[in-house]
């Protein structure tokens, strides 16, 4: 659990007082000439091994990289852990619970601390209760955030003082990924006299945002983050590394959002699941760092694990622009050029697979409904059935009404070109006399306070404010479902008329039900298009062709008349985006001095009435018991593309939900129910979110001969269809072991550990699916739930699974072993189903057998401290 470095291959780094590890020499000692052919990712992973791997494992591990083999697990030691306040807080609740468990067994709780530097940014808890047309929206939304989250923030403040090695950036300062890009990542570290590449894991699937800097940053679940925090290696096999050559240059008026939505469609079709992508070529070299970051941010939407760019002059220019010290920028250049991470040194890199994408093919685009990879060129809105006749009855909202238009998300607000484009479009629209439609709830929520400074410098913030896009917060807001309440009159009209209402946002996900319960569908668009849709007021509007309004002379105004030119965008950036703005924001923010005193108890004083923070139960009762994998009944039989939003939603809690009823019983007023996400530190609230998504389709929930959509289950053997939570409670009372049967891509979406915790607390012991998304599979293992995969070409339909059956798993559990699921049907017939055990490494088997990572931590800690 230490952070010890090796000594072999350690050398002085030319032109500095630092040392570095000469990975090239280590590779060449095994295979002369091999280093020049290695992809960027392989070089960074190899450096990590040379510096940290146990010497006796080094040669075998490096050979996997040199020979592009995937036969051996090797350790990876990320330099940092970054967390947001939902999963980060949940992880810290687990660590506080671990301290209690250690103390109960006679250990010293104060010894439980993160070993790896950990940064927690509070960005997920602000709801847009007041829209951007309210001049005091920011202050009002922040006050509500503090009131609703007092329990959570009390706990987070305690952790900052009680745990070593944790830095906390409090609420109201920005979004984790954008702060990571603009400030936290040094690209190259200088620690203990050694220079080495920044690498990290983050408790959010969009952590790869900083891959744009050439930093390997991957999203993990909270459980895996806890493991890394405590100094454990993250074991991996060499990932598939795919080169993506970008050619051509974007057409005039095309934004990075258009490019990334086109890439999302292209890469999803190319099946890049779990791979590390490396973008190169003339097209990649010409992209600004902001444009690269927009691309890297949407790595999970591609289905990939990482989306890397090489270090080059664009990287250095961006580090300078964002106020990094000149000495640090020089270190990045020196290290990259010495260690072979500079773009020129990668001309001979060989990729097992290379894809080609022409940037000049990209046209103006939105994505939706329902999926980020459902790309629609704006020139084809009518042909695709999205735009159509706009029915504007006086005094009523039109069909397809845009009820939310949000410039939001680190995906786009970390890119000055996208933000400035929105400001210029707003200025042009104001000059033509155009206005926002009154039913559109508009908001601007940048991921960094620097955005406000450069918009003010360019005199564009007032232009956005006059169209209702005032700053409502510096947080994730609408992008993670915290879009806040609608005007009650508008909401009632949506309900009464069963209106097809929509949201348009510059975010990265648009799954049904995610953005707002009353926005039936959502579309992703660039910030300037979001402004245009607020003026149009309906998704039925053909944004390229229809008339947005009449100017002061009565002439029709279309999108083309207000869209800013690339030259103007670039000129405004050159004049208005400055390093001192970033320094002014970040220097005070990172002046972190924490008093670690004897005054703070190492054990948290849990508040018994809290619905936000509660001592976790993972070391006691049934969760400490054995899983037999026998006599399991299905809790749900599900189709393809089940997301973590289905498994444990994040959005607002409704009174008629199981969690809402519980919070009401606990005395919370409905307006302070907050979101599911904010209650994940309290397992009693959070477990009631399991499968609580109203869009769930559980194939067992058959009513009148059809599958009924909703948070529903069927209790067996009675065959009673009921709300999911009532079914879970019934099975918990019976101590009935459960199983879930699912289709392909099970668990895609956010890296939400409660998507695994919830099913484990319900009594689920195994999940059989056609395929698992990477982070969710790891979380299942971390909770002691066995992931099993149907053999290729087989699925639930092959075996006619309807939910009346009982399931057993037999065979010896080992990495990727062949196991057998025995199905016993209602009539007594037994069927054998061959499956693959998706515990992929020996380390995962050991975690599973311990009951999960939290149980394993406690065992290991007590053993090491009682020796």
Curated annotation (Swiss-Prot):
What does the note under cofactor report? Binds 1 [4Fe-4S] cluster per subunit.
Question: Which cofactors are named for this entry?
Answer: [4Fe-4S] cluster
Can you provide one Gene Ontology molecular function annotated for this UniProt record? metal ion binding
GO terms for CC? cytosol
Catalytic activity line of the entry? (2S,3S)-2-methylcitrate = 2-methyl-trans-aconitate + H2O; citrate = D-threo-isocitrate
| Keyword set includes Methyltransferase | no
Q: What class of enzyme is it?
A: lyase
EC? 4.2.1.117, 4.2.1.3
Q: Which residues form the signal peptide?
A: none
Q: Which GO annotations describe the biological process of this protein?
A: propionate catabolic process, 2-methylcitrate cycle; propionate metabolic process, methylcitrate cycle; tricarboxylic acid cycle
Query: What influences the activity of this protein, per its activity regulation comment?
Result: Inhibited by ferricyanide and EDTA.
Q: Which SUPFAM superfamilies match?
A: Aconitase iron-sulfur domain (SSF53732), LeuD/IlvD-like (SSF52016)
Kindly list the residue ranges recorded as spanning the membrane. none
The pathway to which it is assigned is:
Organic acid metabolism; propanoate degradation
Q: Which Pfam families match?
A: Aconitase (PF00330), Aconitase_C (PF00694)
Q: Which residues bind [4Fe-4S] cluster per the record?
A: 410, 476, 479
Going by the UniProt record, its keywords in alphabetical order are: 4Fe-4S, Iron, Iron-sulfur, Lyase, Metal-binding
* Miscellaneous: Together with PrpF, able to restore the growth of prpD mutant on propionate.
Q: What does this protein do?
A: Involved in the catabolism of short chain fatty acids (SCFA) via the 2-methylcitrate cycle II (propionate degradation route). In vivo under anaerobic conditions, AcnD catalyzes the stereospecific dehydration of (2S,3S)-methylcitrate (2-MC) to yield the trans isomer of 2-methyl-aconitate (2-MCA). AcnD can also accept citrate and cis-aconitate, but with a lower efficiency. 2-methylisocitrate and isocitrate are not substrates.
Indicate the family of this protein. Belongs to the aconitase/IPM isomerase family.
Supply the name of the protein: 2-methylcitrate dehydratase (2-methyl-trans-aconitate forming)
From which organism does this entry originate? Answer: Shewanella oneidensis (strain ATCC 700550 / JCM 31522 / CIP 106686 / LMG 19005 / NCIMB 14063 / MR-1)
**According to the entry, what is the taxonomic lineage of the organism?**
Bacteria, Pseudomonadati, Pseudomonadota, Gammaproteobacteria, Alteromonadales
């Amino acid at each position: 659990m230490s952070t010890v470095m090796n000594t072999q291959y350690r050398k002085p780094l030319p032109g500095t007082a630092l040392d570095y590890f000469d990975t090239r020499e280590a590779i060449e000692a095994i295979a002369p000439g091999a280093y020049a052919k290695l992809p960027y990712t392989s070089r960074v992973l190899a450096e990590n091994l040379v510096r940290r791997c146990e010497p006796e494992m080094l040669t075998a591990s490096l050979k996997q990289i040199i020979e592009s083999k995937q036969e051996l697990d090797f350790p990876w030691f990320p330099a940092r852990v970054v967390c947001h306040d939902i999963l980060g807080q949940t992880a810290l609740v687990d660590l506080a619970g671990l301290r209690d468990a250690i103390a109960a067994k006679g250990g010293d709780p104060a010894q439980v601390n993160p070993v790896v530097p950990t940064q927690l940014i509070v960005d997920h808890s602000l709801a847009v209760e007041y829209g951007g047309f309210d001049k005091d929206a920011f202050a009002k939304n922040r006050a509500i955030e503090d009131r609703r989250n007092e329990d959570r923030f009390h706990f987070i403040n305690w952790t900052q003082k009680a745990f070593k090695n944790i830095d906390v950036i409090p609420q109201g300062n920005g979004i984790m990924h954008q702060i990571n890009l603009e400030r936290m990542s040094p690209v190259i570290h200088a620690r203990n006299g050694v220079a080495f590449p920044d690498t990290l894991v983050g408790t959010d699937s969009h952590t790869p945002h900083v891959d744009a800097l050439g930093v390997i940053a991957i999203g993990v679940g909270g459980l895996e983050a806890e493991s890394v925090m405590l100094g454990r290696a993250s074991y991996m096999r060499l990932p598939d590394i795919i080169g993506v050559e970008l050619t051509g240059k974007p057409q005039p008026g095309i934004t990075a959002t258009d490019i990334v939505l086109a890439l999302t469609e292209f890469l999803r079709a190319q099946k890049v699941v779990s791979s590390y992508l490396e973008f190169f070529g003339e097209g990649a070299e010409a992209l600004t760092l902001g444009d690269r970051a927009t691309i890297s941010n949407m790595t999970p939407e591609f289905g990939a694990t990482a989306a890397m760019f090489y270090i080059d002059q664009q990287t250095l220019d961006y580090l300078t622009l964002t106020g990094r010290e000149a000495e640090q920028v020089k270190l990045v250049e020196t290290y990259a050029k010495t260690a072979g991470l500079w773009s020129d040194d990668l001309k001979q890199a060989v990729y097992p697979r290379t894809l080609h994408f022409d940037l000049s093919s990209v046209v103006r685009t939105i994505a939706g409904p329902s999926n980020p990879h459902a790309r629609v060129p704006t020139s084809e809105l009518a042909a695709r059935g999205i735009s159509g006749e706009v029915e504007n009855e006086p005094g009523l909202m039109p069909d397809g009404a845009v009820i939310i238009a949000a410039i939001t998300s680190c995906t786009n607000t970390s890119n000055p070109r996208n933000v400035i484009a929105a400001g210029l479009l707003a200025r042009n629209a104001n000059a033509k006399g155009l206005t926002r439609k009154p039913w559109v709830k508009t908001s601007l929520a940048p991921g960094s306070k620097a955005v406000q400074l450069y918009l003010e410098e360019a005199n564009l913030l007032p232009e956005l404010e006059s169209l209702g896009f005032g700053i409502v917060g510096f947080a994730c807001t609408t992008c993670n479902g915290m879009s806040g309440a609608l005007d009650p009159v508008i909401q009632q009209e949506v309900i009464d008329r069963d209106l097809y209402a929509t949201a348009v946002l510059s975010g990265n996900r648009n799954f049904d039900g995610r953005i707002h319960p009353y926005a039936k569908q959502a579309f992703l668009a660039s910030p300037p298009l979001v402004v245009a849709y607020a003026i149009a007021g309906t998704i039925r509007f053909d944004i390229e062709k229809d008339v947005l309004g009449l100017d002061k002379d009565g002439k029709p105004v279309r999108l083309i008349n207000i869209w800013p030119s690339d030259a103007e965008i670039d000129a405004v950036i050159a004049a208005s985006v400055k390093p001192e703005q970033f320094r002014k924001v970040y220097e005070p923010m990172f002046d972190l001095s924490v008093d670690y005193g004897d005054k703070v108890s190492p054990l948290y004083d849990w508040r018994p009435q809290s619905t936000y923070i509660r001592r976790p139960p993972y070391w006691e009762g049934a969760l400490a018991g054995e899983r037999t994998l026998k006599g399991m009944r299905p809790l749900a039989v599900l189709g393809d593309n089940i997301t973590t939003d289905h498994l444990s939603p994040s959005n607002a809690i409704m009174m008629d939900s199981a969690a809402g009823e519980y919070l009401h019983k606990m005395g919370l007023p409905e307006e302070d129910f907050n979101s599911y996400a904010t209650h994940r530190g309290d397992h009693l609230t959070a477990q009631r979110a399991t499968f609580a998504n109203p869009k769930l389709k559980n194939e067992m929930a058959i009513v009148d001969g059809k599958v009924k959509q909703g948070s529903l289950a069927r209790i067996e053997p009675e065959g009673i269809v009921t709300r999911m939570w009532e079914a879970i409670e019934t099975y918990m009372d019976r101590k009935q072991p459960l199983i879930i049967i699912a289709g392909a891509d099970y668990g895609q979406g956010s890296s939400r550990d409660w998507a695994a915790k919830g099913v484990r607390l319900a009594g689920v012991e195994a999940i059989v699916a056609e395929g698992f998304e990477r982070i969710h599979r790891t979380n299942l293992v971390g909770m002691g739930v066995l992931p099993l995969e149907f053999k290729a070409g087989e699925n639930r339909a092959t075996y006619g699974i309807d939910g009346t059956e009982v399931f057993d798993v037999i065979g010896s559990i080992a990495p990727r072993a062949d196991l057998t699921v025995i199905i016993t049907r209602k009539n007594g017939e037994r069927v054998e189903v061959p499956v693959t055990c998706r515990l992929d490494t020996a380390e995962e088997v050991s975690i599973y057998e311990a009951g999960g990572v939290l149980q394993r931590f406690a065992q290991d800690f007590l053993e090491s401290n009682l020796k």
